[in-house]
Amino acid sequence: MPEETLLAFDFGEKKIGIAIGNTLTRQARPLEIIFSETRAARFGRIGQLLQEWQPQRAVVGLPLTLDGQEQPASARARRFANQLHGRFGLAVELVDERGSSMEAQQLLGTHAADDAVAAAVILQRYLDTLPQP
């Protein structure tokens, strides 16, 4: 597999956690949280990040119930993933995000989850599924 830069998104209607990673290092790290009231502002900032980091692929967390079923937030995450692909022509992968906020809380040692850390957890899970070179 060729080296790729990846951006991951923990999508929420009020804020979006973003992480960055690389298939060569197989490491993900939190990048930032977008707090934007409007869709235009959100996608404007995402466009800036895409231009800055030049990722080959995006990973979007897919919220599922504990038993693996889709829920109302799943449709919103899928719509966001489709918008990323449609607006920016970016390849997008959906990844089960169950437990990512709890894992982020454990990593931070706090009860408040950081959405960028949750995005890094989601991206790390994706990187861990890739075949070894």
UniProtKB/Swiss-Prot annotation:
Domain of life: Bacteria
Ranges in coiled-coil conformation: none
SMART domains xrefs: YqgFc
Alphabetical list of Pfam families matching this protein: RuvX
EC number annotated for this UniProt entry: 3.1.-.-
Keywords of the record: Cytoplasm, Hydrolase, Nuclease, Ribosome biogenesis
Gene Ontology annotations for the cellular component aspect, listed alphabetically: cytosol
Keyword Nuclease: yes
InterPro entries in UniProt: RNaseH-like_sf, YqgF, YqgF/RNaseH-like_dom, YqgF/RNaseH-like_dom_sf
MF (Gene Ontology): nuclease activity
Residue ranges crossing the lipid bilayer per the database entry: none
Compartments reported by the entry: Cytoplasm
One biological process term in Gene Ontology: rRNA 5'-end processing
Function: Could be a nuclease involved in processing of the 5'-end of pre-16S rRNA.
PANTHER family per UniProt: POLYNUCLEOTIDYL TRANSFERASE, RIBONUCLEASE H-LIKE SUPERFAMILY PROTEIN
HAMAP family in the cross-refs: Nuclease_YqgF (MF_00651)
Family as reported in the entry's similarity comment: Belongs to the YqgF nuclease family.
UniProt protein name: Putative pre-16S rRNA nuclease
Source organism: Bordetella parapertussis (strain 12822 / ATCC BAA-587 / NCTC 13253)
